[in-house]
From Swiss-Prot:
Annotated compartments: Cytoplasm; Cell inner membrane
Cysteine pairings via disulfide bonds: none
SUPFAM superfamilies: P-loop containing nucleoside triphosphate hydrolases (SSF52540), Prokaryotic type KH domain (KH-domain type II) (SSF54814)
GO molecular function terms attached to this record: GTP binding; GTPase activity; ribosomal small subunit binding; small ribosomal subunit rRNA binding
Region (G3): 57-60
Taxonomic source organism: Campylobacter jejuni (strain RM1221)
Domain KH type-2: 186-274
Ranges where the record places region G5: 146-148
Protein family per UniProt: Belongs to the TRAFAC class TrmE-Era-EngA-EngB-Septin-like GTPase superfamily. Era GTPase family.
Any one Gene Ontology cellular component term annotated for this protein: plasma membrane
Cited PROSITE patterns: G_ERA (PS51713), KH_TYPE_2 (PS50823)
Ranges for domain Era-type G: 2-167
Annotated HAMAP family: GTPase_Era
Name of the protein this chain belongs to: GTPase Era
Amino acid sequence: MKSGFVSIIGRTNAGKSTLINSLLEEKIALVSHKQNATRRKIKAIVMHEKNQIIFIDTPGLHESGATLNQLLVQSAIKSMGDCDVILFVASVFDSTKDYENFLSLNPQVPHIIALNKVDLTDNATLLKKLSEYAKFSQHFKAIIPYSSKKKSYKKGLLDEIVKYLDEHEYFYNPEFLSASSEKELYRDFILESIYENLSDELPYSSEVLINRTKDTPNLLILEANIITDTNSHKGMLIGKEGATLKRIGKDARFKISKLAQKKVLLKLFVTVKKNWQKDEEFLKKLLNDEN
């Protein structure tokens, strides 16, 4: 029996959250084509044969001077020192520059490369990309082609990860899908619905705070605040006669209900907090692992 923690690292939009969801075969991690959709570290628990692997999905690595983005990168780097194995995720279409940047951080634990989205390319392109990574072979333990859409890739990746975990009793109940709090997951589903329903720029000025939860045997009651930075953005989030906010709520309610396996009553409010993305204390509260 082995058990350990695996930090998933990579640039924004490399497919980290989609990879976690495919390993779980459940929707846990927020998935969006927009950069830095993942703002908190989500712990997802995967049982592989008799072994327990706890994946930590981190914000994407990138370069930016904005306070929020700086804190996101700090969070990702910190997770590298708090794990047993690092899984570096890169798309088969990415250059190796992102991997070189990762190596410059001097990771101190073993790492494996997951070359993602291989179902979208041909064998010749895949072989060319593998040869590009070959010059770094002294650094990584293995490079594994992966597709989140094909289950046949799952076993090979998990088998490789387990090699580098220690013998240890389970850290979590094997029935659990995630060690992240339910509030974090509900928050991410609401934020994802904002990403899906609004233009590219607006979601970056928005955050979600869960104000109240009440869980009964047949009904989950949630109240949440959508934080945005201007009155004009507030108007866009609400929409004409509340249509946009209703659509966001409907989409989020469906996702939360699927996870909770019960009916959900979701009440959403929109609040303006100017310059929240530059308020370091507010951001640290948002990004706190225990939040």
